[in-house]
Amino acid sequence: MDEIEKIALLRDELEALKLCDLDDLTQAEAGVKMGVSRGTIQRMLTIARKKVAKALSKGQAIVFE
């Protein structure tokens, strides 16, 4: 049986995704909550969203690191 490919989502990427997309915080608010800049949140969101989209479109598992 073939093993399902995995994509690793970092804890900070997951937290940024949760705060902005589920909790409806702005990137600036999420940055304050996480102790990072708005730009860092924006970067984490871009990376996380691409990883999730890739995993969903290719049937890959998402693992959290």
Locations of regions flagged by a protein language model:
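Residues within the DNA-recognition helix of helix-turn-helix
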Residues: M44-I47
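Short amphipathic helical patch at the helix-1/turn junction of helix-turn-helix
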Residues: C20-L22
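Short, Lys/Arg-enriched anionic-surface-contact patches
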Residues: M1-R11
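Helix-turn-helix DNA-binding motif, specifically the short coil turn and the N-cap/start of the second
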Residues: T26, G35-T40
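C-terminal flanking helix
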Residues: R49-L56
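Short alpha-helical "packing" element that flanks the helix-turn-helix/winged-helix DNA-binding module
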Residues: A16-L17
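Alpha-helical residues within the helix-turn-helix
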Residues: V32
